């Protein structure tokens, strides 16, 4: 039994909530590399830009490290995990302060060769 070749790319501490990235990543999971690029270019979400960079990086890793062609690649796994939260304070009226949480996330993309 031949082991499937798989490469991954990670983006850590992306300054965006995991909930917003999951909305986009659910639409590219299981798609081919070209379909994912087209989807990410035309979706109107801010999360598309770091995902586009990450998918391109994973494809470059597959091409350079394993010699796989980009037209045969498939996104086999795509996940988002919550990372640390930075806490800030917003000054308000009468000496009060509201806390603001700045969320970050870790994004993992795994790409493998499409089975024929």
UniProtKB/Swiss-Prot annotation:
**Gene Ontology molecular function:** rRNA binding; structural constituent of ribosome
Q: Name one Pfam family in it.
A: Ribosomal_L22
Query: What keywords sit in the KW lines?
Result: Chloroplast, Plastid, Ribonucleoprotein, Ribosomal protein, RNA-binding, rRNA-binding
Answer whether the UniProt record assigns the keyword Metal-binding to this protein: no
Single GO biological process annotation from the record:
translation
Where, subcellularly, is it found?
Plastid, Chloroplast
Which CDD domains has this protein been placed in? Ribosomal_L22 (cd00336)
Q: Tell me, in one coarse class, where this protein mainly resides.
A: plastid
Q: Which family does it belong to?
A: Belongs to the universal ribosomal protein uL22 family.
What role does it play? This protein binds specifically to 23S rRNA. The globular domain of the protein is located near the polypeptide exit tunnel on the outside of the subunit, while an extended beta-hairpin is found that lines the wall of the exit tunnel in the center of the 70S ribosome.
Q: Subunit notes for this chain?
A: Part of the 50S ribosomal subunit.
Protein name, UniProt field:
Large ribosomal subunit protein uL22c
Q: Organism, per UniProt? A: Psilotum nudum (Whisk fern)
Give the classification, highest ranks. Answer: Eukaryota, Viridiplantae, Streptophyta, Embryophyta, Tracheophyta
Name of the gene encoding the protein in the UniProt record: rpl22
């Amino acid at each position: 039994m031949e082991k499937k070749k798989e490469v991954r790319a990670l983006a850590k501490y992306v300054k965006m909530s995991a909930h917003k990235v999951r909305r986009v990543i659910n639409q590219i999971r299981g798609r081919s590399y070209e379909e994912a690029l087209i989807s990410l270019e035309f979706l109107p979400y801010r999360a598309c830009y770091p995902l586009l960079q990450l998918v391109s990086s994973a494809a470059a890793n597959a091409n350079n490290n394993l010699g796989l062609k980009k037209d045969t690649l498939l996104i086999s796994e795509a996940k988002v995990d919550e990372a640390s939260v930075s806490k800030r304070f917003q000054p308000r009226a009468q000496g009060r302060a509201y806390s603001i949480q700045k969320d970050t996330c870790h994004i993992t993309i795994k790409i493998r060769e499409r089975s024929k």
